[in-house]
């Protein structure tokens, strides 16, 4: 079964329809099915799939389904990464743009929500709720709003960036897009201050870079050996470094510096000077934030060298500013410890020397820098000459001049110059504190060379930068690092320098300006100084000794050379030949090795290609197998999903599905789900019914109780309301009366005031009437004329309208009368049809009842007949057993007298022979016939089933044939006095009553098996008496040929003639053949097949149960050929459709009359 899938165009239309009706989830599922279907993956171009992909990503953004968007993006990448990279780039950029727009909208919404909250109440800005919230969670309203509104979209945008980076990390065609998205992710972290996400992003990019460096053999993989890839990675790491510095994540910045240095070392091309300058600048900033002044100054020095050498348009001011920066950073380096090896005894992961070596590698230095080496390099580069006079003096005061009494005052002036500089461009202010510390250390060292002891007060006067506590701390640090011998006497508030002359654990190397050595150092180096002085004295006393020794040594060397020069020359020539031979041998070995290596590589390449081809074939087979399995599983899941979706549209279906989890639903099939749905529906119906009953009872009780309680309250309320209404009416009436009186008084006063104007009014009216009397009369005539014309017109219109109304009313009455008569006729016809249908129904019911009664009666007779047959069979078996025992006894008695039989025969003549033959024959014949009867009884039982089958058809026509059969039976009884038609009581049949002739009375119809037995026994006796006549056919006419010679009932047969027809004459004539059923009709064969069988079909087989040569129809009393009414099988119960068919058939088949 093929899986039904929609085409991409239809899926897009379907999704738009779902979106219009407010079902985005259904729309997303529709589009997702397209991307999951592998049939459409490569069958359509990007012009068809790209709009669908944009709609898919739009729905993912709207619903915040980042994992579903990831799945679709991966599918789209696999489809178009080698076909159309621009389409993939447009889709990814559009996806990220939508995510950014939604995030910005959420940020604006969050800010607007906070603004609304802040402007809600200007009089009460700090509400109790806001105070409690800030005290509990430590967040303001903006933070809470961002967490609720903004944070979900920020998380979605972050996941989108991560998915796109993972999608494009190994695709060389989308390498530029990958680095653009990385920069967008850095901007995201800066904009929303996501430090933890920034760290994860750095780790992710570093992991991607490691993967690229490890494997670069893929077809679409990114190769780190490409110059473009190296430059893109370097630019991205520089951007990462800038972002880390802005976010003050110095650890990530240091890791980024390591990555940048690794990329620059990996690149075969020298980085551009701009990149290197940016690198040294950022590195100096990181070292400054880390507090490593030594490497900070080294980085600035490298930057200064690079800028000075490569920047051609560098101005003097810029050079002076950079030189001052470098000089001040170098001078601010703390004085080094005299024993750095002390750190070796501290347990740490890495020793300081290893760390320093690693940092020196980042700067491109062969060994870690020191303060002395940096100052020496600064002097070599002539940096002190490039700076201003003040900073040049600073260098001289700290590194050249020895003036401890004025050192701090001089440095303070430089500090004041730095502090008073512009704040925006002042890059030297971070070095002030370090410069002060270096100045204090210089002061202490210079003081120790001048003074043996000094008071704290005096030393504080000289060290104007610090207080007593800071000074004491610096002194302790100097002793800790074993730089100086210092002892502090707090009792005297004094400081002692170099008091222990026996202690000097290091060689004194003056760093900076020095006046003299310390006493302990002088004692430690006394022997060395003595040796130097003595050597100098010997050289003065014996000035030519050394020259003579050198001349003698030279002569010996020349003599030795002349002795070995030839031998050495030959050795050198031989060595040269050996070297040439060795080179040739090595070259041959290399060529052979290269050829072998080439052959080996070619063989490995061939094997690899074969293995790869085999692997691809296996993968293709595996993909096909999985695809087939997935399609089958998808079909099952789709059918199940459709069933679940169909069920979920109903309330009970949703309730039933809510009880099942995903695993439970997958284990069920559609039938089980439908079954559970029906069960759930029934259960809900029962629950609803019970709830309604309980609710009905509860509401009934509640309403009755409520109304009983309401009655006194209503009475009280009505009484109070009547009182209040009465009071209100009285007050209102009183107010109304007062207002009416006041109005009356006001009107009367007004009337009295206006009475004096009546004469003036009358005069004015009279004058006006006189002026306009003629005009009034003229207009009055025109009005009367127009009025008369309008009256006539309206009267004429009314006459016409009334005439038309009467005509329409007459037509309506006629139409209503016609419709009424038609309705009466239709109702009368419908009533007649209903009455006729009811009469037919009653008639059919009566006929069915009649047939049912006949069928029950016939069935009872059949059961009675079967019971009697069974009893006769049992009795016959017992009689046969008794006869066999008696025959055995008689055989034992007459066999010894075998000679008497002939004499008896001769004495008796023929009659005697006949007597003994007739007396002996029935014994064997009786046994034989008994067996035949038993066998015939079995056949009767077998044929009983056929009669039962035909009984249904006979029963249908039994009602019409009953009277005819009874009439023929009465005629036969009156015409024939044969013993076959006489019925004796069962008692007489059982007692064996004899007739008037002295012979046993013949058996009744219920003993039909006896009639056939007697007839056969008589025929058997005749056969023995007259042997030659055994071949003659002495049967009467009705027994020969199997057909009756007459059309009447069989003589001596009390059974009614069979309506189904047993005579060939009963076949329908030519006129009746059209009414017959087809020959293949089973009912026709069953009804007509009883007597239409030929002699061959009715004749028994040889050795059959009859025991004679005659047919089964021989003898008119044979029960097989003349079954009575009680032998007919019981009719079948009619089905409703069969009754209708048979009702139609009755009119067709009952027209065939017996002739």
Curated annotation (Swiss-Prot):
Q: What UniProt keywords are attached to this protein's entry? A: Cytoplasm, Initiation factor, Protein biosynthesis, RNA-binding
What is annotated about its quaternary structure and interactions?
Component of the eukaryotic translation initiation factor 3 (eIF-3) complex. The eIF-3 complex interacts with pix.
Is Nucleus a UniProt keyword of this protein? no
**Which residue ranges have biased composition labelled Gly residues?**
1104-1118
Return the annotated region ranges for Disordered: 589-613, 836-1155
Q: Which GO terms describe its molecular function?
A: mRNA binding; translation initiation factor activity
* Source organism (scientific name): Drosophila pseudoobscura pseudoobscura (Fruit fly)
| The family this protein is said to belong to | Belongs to the eIF-3 subunit A family.
The record's GO CC annotations read:
eukaryotic 43S preinitiation complex; eukaryotic 48S preinitiation complex; eukaryotic translation initiation factor 3 complex; eukaryotic translation initiation factor 3 complex, eIF3e; eukaryotic translation initiation factor 3 complex, eIF3m; multi-eIF complex
Q: Provide the transmembrane region boundaries.
A: none
Coiled-coil boundaries = none
Question: Which GO biological process annotations does it have?
Answer: formation of cytoplasmic translation initiation complex; regulation of translational initiation; translation reinitiation
* Alphabetized PANTHER family for the sequence: EUKARYOTIC TRANSLATION INITIATION FACTOR 3 SUBUNIT A, EUKARYOTIC TRANSLATION INITIATION FACTOR 3, THETA SUBUNIT
Q: Where is the composition biased (Basic and acidic residues)?
A: 836-900, 925-987, 1004-1057, 1066-1101, 1125-1145
State the name under which the record lists this protein. Eukaryotic translation initiation factor 3 subunit A
